[in-house]
From Swiss-Prot:
Residue numbers annotated as active site: 41 (charge relay system), 86 (charge relay system), 178 (charge relay system)
Similarity-based family: Belongs to the peptidase S1 family. Snake venom subfamily.
pH dependence: Optimum pH is 7.0-8.5.
Reactions the enzyme catalyzes: Selective cleavage of Arg-|-Xaa bond in fibrinogen, to form fibrin, and release fibrinopeptide A. The specificity of further degradation of fibrinogen varies with species origin of the enzyme
Protein name as it appears in the record: Thrombin-like enzyme leucurobin
Site label Required for specificity, positions: 172
Gene source species: Bothrops leucurus
Keyword field: Blood coagulation cascade activating toxin, Disulfide bond, Glycoprotein, Hemostasis impairing toxin, Hydrolase, Protease, Secreted, Serine protease, Toxin
A Pfam family hit: Trypsin
Cellular location(s): Secreted
GO biological process, one term: proteolysis
Length: 231
């Protein structure tokens, strides 16, 4: 996260960290004891998922690591378009217990409204050159825009996507924050999919997969319908 501050240790009990190698990682959101939600483009064959992590250098006493038991991507996703249906549900190999630093974030009950102030968070780059990564996650506030702002900036916007950022630039998600949550008015509304390169450019908000539009799919998969298709 560019232009943010260190997150409070108690602010992100639902934020999980997926690592595949030291240089490749993503954010994830715990939505119940056994499932996390992230971006489809974060999918890797062998991944480790750490819940209750804060500082990379010092483990929280309740930090846990899980592997993925099964990963679910929309069967109707266009494989060669990163931003199409960029959402993935992962079932953990064993459930996690709620603790001081572990608690799921519930799915949204309403869609977000344009103009909302939204919170972003992650262990991603804190410099636009993407050469500095923090030991603890950084948090910042950004704004939810009308989708036309992104359509004008990038000549288009995928369906079921939110457009969020800061028009003057300087505050944004960045490399390594992918898959992490966009939280608007306390509700889990978006999953970081894609943004400008370099990050935090003026008038170039980022794309967040709109969680609300995928609720039927998410609920079907969790209920055991493994072949549910996305809207």
């Amino acid at each position: 996260v560019i232009g943010g501050d260190e997150c409070d240790i108690n602010e992100h009990p639902f934020l999980a960290f997926m690592y595949y190698s030291p240089r490749y990682f993503c954010g994830m959101t715990l939505i119940n004891q056994e499932w996390v939600l992230t971006a489809a483009h974060c999918n890797r064959r062998f991944m480790r998922i750490x819940x209750x992590x804060h500082a990379g250098s010092v483990a929280n006493y309740d930090e846990v690591v899980r592997x993925x038991x099964x990963x679910f991507i929309c069967p109707n996703k266009k494989k060669n378009v990163i931003t199409d249906k960029d959402i993935m549900l992962i079932r953990l190999d064993r459930p996690v217990k709620n603790s001081e630093h572990i608690a799921p974030l519930s799915l949204p009950s309403n869609p977000p409204s344009v103009g909302s102030v939204c919170r972003i968070m992650g262990w991603g780059a804190i410099t636009t050159s993407e050469d500095t990564y923090p030991d603890v996650p950084h948090c910042a506030n950004i704004n939810l825009f009308n989708n036309t702002v992104c359509r004008e900036a990038y000549n288009g916007l995928p369906a079921k996507t939110l457009c969020a950022g800061v028009l003057q630039g300087g505050i944004d998600t960045c490399g390594g924050d992918s898959g992490g949550p966009l939280i608007c008015n306390g509700q889990f509304q978006g999953i970081l999919s894609w943004g400008s390169d370099p990050c935090a450019e003026p008038r170039k908000p980022a794309f967040y997969t709109k969680v609300f539009d995928y609720l039927p799919w998410i609920q079907s998969i969790i209920a055991g319908n493994k072949t549910a298709t996305c809207p």
